[in-house]
Amino acid sequence: MEDINKNSQQQTAGVDSRLYDQEYFEAIDGAHYSSEGKTAPKFIYAIQKSGIEKENSALDIGFGRGDLLMALAKQGVDVTGIDYSQDALEIARKAIAKQPAEWKNKIKVLHSNATALEFSDQSFDYIFMTDLVEHLYPPELQKCFDECKRVLKPNGKLIVHTAPNRWYNDFGYPLWEQPMNRILNKLFRQKLLTRPIRTETDLNVHINEQTILSLKKYLVKTGFKSKIWLGSEYVTPIKKDSPGMQLLENFRQLFCHAYPLSLIPPFNLLFCNDIWAIAKKD
């Protein structure tokens, strides 16, 4: 692993990087997979959908705990990661150091900003942006996409995952799922999700929630040819340990998300919480 600690001289003002500290990374989605030495399904899916091969080069923007970096290296891919959080750099560096030499030597990490990529034109075959879009203000996000297009090779691909889906937060959750969860909690003595629509952390860092239409608009403006879809992760029944709990989970998805109708329009627009995109540079 090559550890390059730099500060971009062209950083754009955005969310304070100090908000992304050790406590933040221990609490966010997928942390339990990382603590168990596993790869979260989200990152496995991103790699599978990308079509990346081991002879390709990749950039991971906003690497966080370093989960995707390590997953790509295990596939034989030479990957560079950037993040502007100092804590992210330290967390990822420690995790990468525990990996076998043939994997960790394929990873480079850089302390840098997503809006001013410190790479030459046409440097990478693939760029991954998983759970970064919603953390960038609109001008930052457009600049980041412009930079991605610049450093991608011809026919290179940008793989994007962002959550939450703004329509889910504005309509699906508060108007249907949250009240339905409260009913199920009373009927079956469960502890289903009844959180605020947006937590304090969400309000601090999720400053640019997307819909499939708004994300498409950014990518079109940048000049990418893109495919955008809503992921089914959130609205598909989770596998449970016992038949009784599985039955309850299936009933919850039916009751709270209208499953399996939640997999198709217009229901998926309101209940699917994951937005994916693959954008290609001509």
Predicted features and spans:
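A short His-aromatic
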Residues: 134-136
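Conserved N-terminal segment of class I S-adenosyl-L-methionine
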Residues: 1-120, 126-130, 142-145, 231-232, ...
